[in-house]
Amino acid sequence: TTPTASGNQAMSIHDITFCRPSATVSVTKISSILSDPVNGTTNPKRIPDAIVQYCILVSNSGSATANAVVATDSLAGPFTYVPGSMRSGTNCGTAASVEDDNATGSDETDPYGAFLGGSTITATAASLAPASSFALTFQVTLD
């Protein structure tokens, strides 16, 4: 563009795309019934005293590392947390690292942390690389 006043200059810029890597984090929660007091582990139903396992899966589908990842889940509902049932890992099927129920100790950085505070489950990861995930599983008894 040609300036119309002396001392002014202008330039037109278009069609520029900035490609900055970014993290794209998603959270999925799934459940499966492990057993109930009537059917045991054979075709269990969601009835009182059934044991249900939940998995919180946190995934990064972006092109950059996500840092200081925190996922929380409220345990409000007609169920009771099963103490000592928390496990962490890279996916729901293989989450086997034992997590205690408190927010202290070496299990909080192994490489994932998890704890129960009041009625909230919190899962943490210092970082989550592109195309990776971490999972936290825990169990509840239906009231």
Question: Which residues does each predicted region cover?
Answer:
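Exported/extracytosolic protein signature
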Residues: 1-143
